[in-house]
Every structure is written in structure tokens, then in C-alpha cells.
Amino acid sequence: MSRRRRFKGRDVHGIILLDKPGGITSNDALQQVKRIYNAAKAGHTGALDPLATGMLPICFGEATKFSQFLLDADKRYQVTARLGVRTDTSDSEGSVVSVRPVDVSEDQLAQALDKFRGDIMQVPSMFSALKHQGRPLYEYAREGIEIEREARPITIYSLELKAFSGEEISLEVHCSKGTYIRSLIDDLGELLGCGAHVIQLRRTQVACYPNDKMLNLEKLNEILDECREQGVPPRERLDQYLLPMDSAVYSLPEVNMPPVLAAYVTQGQAVMVPHAPIEGFVRMTVGPEAEFIGVGEIDDDGKVAPRRLVRIGGDMPDAEEQAE
């Protein structure tokens, strides 16, 4: 009996800014969006806890090659925490480990918050996806195993108190990659001497993506249903919401090159481009229309070396053809 061939979906290239709902994992959200778009390949760029809502950039197709730049980008969050109760997960989904009275003034809270601004060291939560010997820490935590974790450097660019009412505080956080908001709240609670845990968490920004470009699952499913009812190919409407794949690397300096040099780059060769930066990653574009072809890095000899190349459709003409 022959195996039924598995349908792999269509080629989609670009980025959607999903407004992830609470109560599901980031991977669950990813799979739903992948199904809606009928996409062959997709990946998200930094997991949100099931409790958390907000911006979850999802990359399709060739855009997945540039997801690491979004993983490394700054993030912004809105978080509400409850003082006086500490949990093992540092959020409301965990088990309570201590209950203490709250006797904190706004001045004391302001002084405590100041300790967390700037460059600090943070110990990741045991209930995180960080790997130890190939397994995420949360698997050990669920088995009651405590793994020693080293503190890691992070940067809190801004930490603003938006509301303080009795046993609840609301904060806005602008932070570097690798920051765990649950750990931040847990550390704050311990510094205040009363304990604390996250009760609401929303990511409002990743890199420079505006939050008004986010779409939720309800809206995407609504578009899909309308297309089916009207006999319209879903891609005609869904793909209008895709952001260009190079939006993931807009923060990189652009190096524009003529087609003859781009032909060498697409074959994996480094090239010398006038006026290129002297170091770091660059966003490579071609010709007067600045067509995005990938991300390069400046070598020690000053040449632009390809690191991640876009491969869509036919190949570009080779260097010999361009030189004719």
C-alpha cells in the first residue's frame, strides 16, 4: 500500500505581526497562522509565555533566514504584578510558595525600580525554555529538579511605573534580548521584601515594528472564511498583510551594489563595495530599486561577504553574464 503524499503548503515569503492571545503557547499560535496561510515554512521569533499576549512576529519562507535578528532585537512590554505573593513560576499560573504582607510606599517602590535600570545581571527562571544538556529548564522544574543557572547580562533601557494601587503595580519595560519579565518581577518582589508575581503580560513592540500593524487570530480566520464564502483565493487578501522580509533587518546599514557585484555575492563570493561600513552586518540591496538580496558581513579585508541570501524563483544571472 503506497503512502499518501503529505501536502506541504505553498511558498509564502514575508512577516506577519500576530497579536498572540493568552492561554495558548507561541507554537500553537504559529501552527494556527501557518494553517491559515497554508504556508510550507514558518517560524516565530521569540516565544511568549502562554499567559502573555501581544506581538509575536511570524516569519514565512525565506524570511525565516532573518528571524535571528528579531530574536536579538529590543522588546517592549506592559506588565501587571501582584505584590505579597510569590509563585514557583513567577506568574499566576504557578504554585504559591510564599505569602507575605505588603508594606511598600511609592517612594520605596521607586527606589527599588531604580536598581533594575541600565545594565544588570539576571538569573533566568527555572520555568524558561533555556536548554541544559539538550532539555529546556522547565522540564527539569516540573520534575522538581533545580539546575544551577548563571546570571546573564541584560539591559533595561527604561522601566516606568504606570500604576500602583495597594497590592498591584503596572509597569512599562523596554529591554534587551534575553530579558525575562517574570524574573524581573520576582527579583523586584524579593528586593521589596514581600514577593511578587506576574498576573498580566503583554509585548507591545519587537525591534521597530509598530503595534498598530498587529493582527489577531480572529481577524485572520475571518478573512479566510470570507475568502472561502466569496470564492476568492485566500492569498489575494491574506498576503496583503505580509510585511517585507527585509523589515526584520531594517536596523542594519544598507549596502547597495550594482547587478554585476550582486551576481558574485549570490554565488557566495565576497566583494568590495565603495562606501560600505568598516564592520558589522549589512543589508544588501541591488540596483536603483534597492531589491533586497540578503544580509552580509564586512570581512577583515573590508569586503562584503554574504551570510544569509534570499532564494526565490530563478537564480540571478551569473557574474560572466552580467559582465558581458
UniProtKB/Swiss-Prot annotation:
Give the Enzyme Commission number: 5.4.99.25
Question: Do you know which Gene3D superfamilies this protein is assigned to?
Answer: Pseudouridine synthase, PUA domain
Q: Which reaction does it catalyse?
A: uridine(55) in tRNA = pseudouridine(55) in tRNA
Sorted alphabetically, the Gene Ontology BP terms of this entry are: mRNA pseudouridine synthesis; tRNA pseudouridine synthesis
Q: What is annotated as the active site? A: 49 (nucleophile)
Family listed: Belongs to the pseudouridine synthase TruB family. Type 1 subfamily.
The protein depicted here goes by the name: tRNA pseudouridine synthase B
User: What is the native source organism of this protein?
Assistant: Tolumonas auensis (strain DSM 9187 / NBRC 110442 / TA 4)
